[in-house]
A protein has these predicted regions:
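Glycine-rich flexible loops
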Residues: 1-293
Length: 293
């Protein structure tokens, strides 16, 4: 039987972690855990995630209605997007939403995390797309999020933040850490002249490692990024899924057919110009997040 009090303590611990790592400010962010098909624990609204204790945690049903909450506490207004994840992904046991500085800066700049630059990111995350903007606390966010749920375990929320989910609370939180670390490395490597991406053969090897590990969750191994026809990266020889065509900024082809994913979609001079603009754009957003001019 699930020990709810222990899970509440775990939620508080993760809340302290995301607060200590500057993934949230003030009362931002929210966390939820699935108990069963109709009972979920979630963080309350209007409370700093760094200072929660177990009695702060609320319980809701599959529609987000309150089952139990202590006086003075009510569920986060963002519980709607958590519920949509659980509805569409029965394998998911926990969802974490935060505003990590680097990942959120990419979300604000409209740049998905899709470049294969680090083994851990390729194995654990694959690509991290951007779900279209939705007004906070409305159904716009879950509605815009829904089409990504069958294929990804992490998304950036346009002009908002990041959302990760996995089989349990710790795994969902670790994905959030991975997303932020990936974003930071990508940003800083751009400052040093641009990241060196893995070639197709190395990507294939990393996908095979993931299969051998039997890692849970979805993984967009057959996703090929070609945002605006400019930055096309190596697809590992597997860039096909007709369903992916619904995602903005991506281009796909059939397995077994010629794939352009190992070719630059723009001349070197144009690519350099785009990289310079990218660095300037992200730097501006990061400085704003840090309160610097």
């Amino acid at each position: 039987m699930v020990n709810e009090f222990e899970i509440k303590k775990q939620i508080c611990d993760i809340g302290r972690r995301i607060y200590a790592r500057n993934m949230v400010a003030a009362n931002d962010g929210n966390i939820s855990v699935k108990l069963n098909d109709n009972e979920f624990l979630c963080t309350p609204t209007g409370v700093s995630k760094g200072f929660m204790t177990p009695e702060f945690i609320c319980k809701v049903d599959a529609q987000g209605n309150v089952i139990q909450a202590n006086p003075g506490f009510k569920p986060s207004s963002e519980i709607k997007m958590h519920m949509r994840v659980y509805q569409k992904r029965p394998d998911v046991g926990s969802v974490v939403h935060a505003h990590p500085i680097y990942a959120t800066s990419f979300a604000i700049a409209g740049i998905p995390l899709t470049q294969p630059i680090m083994p851990e990111a390729v194995i654990a995350l694959g690509c991290v797309p951007i779900a279209e903007y939705g007004t906070p606390s409305t159904m716009e966010i879950p509605d815009n999020l829904e089409k990504y749920l069958p294929y990804f375990d992490a998304v950036l929320l346009e002009n908002h933040g990041a959302l990760t989910w996995s089989t349990d609370l710790n795994a969902a939180y670790m994905k959030m850490e991975s997303v932020e670390f990936y974003a930071q490395l990508l940003y800083q490597s751009k400052l040093l002249g641009g990241p060196k991406e893995f070639d197709k053969e190395n990507i294939k090897k990393l996908y095979e490692i993931r299969r051998k590990f039997g890692m849970p969750g979805k993984h967009p191994a057959n996703l090929c990024q070609n945002k605006d026809g400019v930055n096309c990266h190596n697809c590992g020889g597997a860039c096909h899924n007709e369903d992916y065509k619904q995602f903005p900024g991506y281009q796909y082809d059939f397995v077994g057919k010629d794939c352009d994913c190992d070719k630059d979609a723009a001349p070197a001079a144009d690519t350099a110009k785009n990289d310079a603009e990218l660095v300037a754009q992200i730097t501006k957003q990061v400085m704003a997040q840090l309160g610097l001019k």
